[in-house]
């Protein structure tokens, strides 16, 4: 792992066991990706993308969904938000691979004061309206936001699309592989899938 800068999951996902040395050097593994991120990302703004709460504050006008923060004494605001939105997505301030995200159904909440207290205790202070997706995307895996991931690089003048992938969940709160999700690579020019879907357990998902 140290020699090739390859994490365990990279080794599995990229089939390193069957690749030769030349092929291994072409893989953008997590350690390499992190290195480039810290090299080229502007330190002044990098923190916004690690802080889920700050992200919503900064990009609120572009989110296309309602959100609120749980504070010491806003039980009534939380209840009103829940009455307006039947599905609630909560987020802790930081976390990766979907670990900071949870989903609740307003109809199942009987005591809003107790729910408010539990959210504060667990640090789930950001509440978001659930995203409703296009029917064609939702039809593949309903119940989870199936996100399109775009890896891009800005050279100072132009933004280059390096890779695109479509992720799908399995009905959980997030589409991450830790939740059983899978992905398929997309053609950057057409947006069409380049093949079947794959998860972190070696399963192939026919699309």
Task: Indicate where each model-derived feature is located.
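ATP-dependent carboxylate/phosphate-activation module, predominantly the ATP-grasp catalytic core
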Residues: 141, 145-207
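Low-complexity, highly charged intrinsically disordered N-terminal segments
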Residues: 1-61
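Active-site nucleotide/adenylate-binding loops and adjacent lid/helix of ATP-dependent enzymes
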Residues: 35-156
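Short, solvent-exposed coil/turn linker segments
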Residues: 20, 104-106, 187
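Short N-terminal signal/transit or membrane-insertion segments
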Residues: 15-33, 79-100, 197-202
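Histidine (H) residue identity feature
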Residues: 4, 30-32, 85, 116, ...
